[in-house]
Design a protein with these regions (language model features):
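N-terminal secretory/targeting leader peptides
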Residues: 2, 7-28, 35-130, 145-372
Length: 372
């Protein structure tokens, strides 16, 4: 977000001034709002129209539209409406689209360091902690530096920490590390390198192409993201085995993009409205995910899907693969190493705090619901 500082004082001043303005100058402000020209932005998401992720994109747009009154309107088109999902960044940078909704890992082909916002080792961080690193630990400046290095002219807002993603959907459960060798598997971002190192033949398909590829036998297994998206995209219609828990993309979040020139042309108060709408959407998305994912998890089990915990041996093998990949990529790409070093330093401090302070909620759940 723009002009982020650890202090909450600017936010309080903004809210105080906004409230005072609404109460004290309503008579003057109303005519200005009603006669002001509406700025309309056309966005595209990287998600199919039926995916809950596209719903999240529309949720953000609605917050902007509501908060800005009639002064700023955002319309969000589904993936492929203007450009393919993996071409969103270029389309926004060039002004073909005014903005977009996706994930940073989809830009992996531009610079491998971009995949580290979600698809990477994480160093024990969860998605919420990675967002803390991004906004308070230097990540935002690093992302801007990478975009400048590849001549991408966008304003980027990260938001919406995603729940831990499953290992994936398979025709039969994956019991051993050796089961991954030779498997045709779908994933994206730096996880492509991780699974390739583990012996898989990886195909980084966009979300809308995964289930048809599984159905036709073009791939043996695939991951997308969560119970709600996987159910809506039709995974349980073609395979019935889902492996839960993985380190392949354990720190992912969404990205909202604006074309920089069009964003810069907005007045300061609308830029600030966008800033706070992103934060509101981030909280709302994380709450909705808990509700919807848990409901869809139950529905998937009712539909005959078999869920298995990914064996610890596979999780350890993932971490070992990450060790090799970050060493190799860090040597090849100075920006990659710069991001890795910054994440590791933040994770060492914040992870120690979280691991020591947070109670074992699973213990309480098992106590109350007799789950052994």
């Amino acid at each position: 977000m723009t002009d982020r500082t650890p202090s909450a004082a600017p936010r309080r001043r903004f809210l105080k001034n906004a409230t005072a303005g609404a109460v004290g100058t309503a008579a003057l402000a109303a005519p200005m709002v009603s006669t002001a020209q509406t700025v309309s932005f056309r966005f595209q998401s990287t998600w199919p129209a039926k995916d809950i992720f596209h719903e999240y994109a529309n949720d953000f747009a609605k917050k902007i539209n509501d908060m800005a009154g009639n002064r700023l309107k955002i319309e969000v088109l589904p993936a492929g409406s203007v450009v393919p999902a993996f071409q969103l960044l270029d389309a926004v940078s060039k002004g073909t689209l005014d903005g977009g909704h996706g994930v940073v890992a989809y830009h992996y082909g531009k610079n491998s360091a971009l995949a580290l916002w979600g698809s990477g080792p994480g160093f024990g961080m969860d998605p919420n902690m990675l967002l803390a690193w991004h906004y308070y630990g230097g990540g935002e400046a690093l992302l801007q530096e990478i975009y400048r290095s590849i001549n991408i002219d966008v304003v980027s807002f990260l938001y919406g920490p995603m729940p831990t993603q499953p290992f994936g959907w398979f025709k039969k459960p994956i019991a051993r590390v050796d089961d991954i060798k030779g498997m045709k598997f779908r994933t994206v971002g730096l996880a492509v390198d991780m699974y390739t190192d583990m012996g898989a033949a990886v195909n980084p398909l966009p979300g809308g192409e995964i289930v048809p590829a599984l159905d036709r036998g073009l791939i043996d297994g695939a991951e997308f993201n969560n119970a709600s998206s996987d159910r809506l995209l039709g995974f349980p219609d073609v395979v019935k085995n889902c492996m839960l828990q993985s380190f392949h993309q354990s720190t992912e979040q969404f990205e909202i993009l604006f074309n920089r020139a069009k964003y810069n042309a907005l007045p300061a108060d609308l830029k600030k409205t966008i800033d706070y709408a992103v934060e509101a959407a981030s909280a709302d998305m994380s709450w909705k995910a808990v509700d919807r994912n848990s409901k869809d998890y139950e529905e998937l089990k009712k539909a005959g899907v078999n869920f298995y915990k990914t064996p610890d041996a596979i999780l350890r093998a993932q971490l070992a693969a990450w060790d090799k990949i970050i060493e190799k990529k860090g040597t090849e790409n100075p920006l990659f190493k710069k991001v890795i070093d910054a994440q590791r330093a933040f994770a060492r401090r914040a992870g120690a705090w979280q691991n020591d302070y947070l109670v074992d909620f699973k213990m309480a759940y098992n106590h109350y619901f007799a789950r052994r």
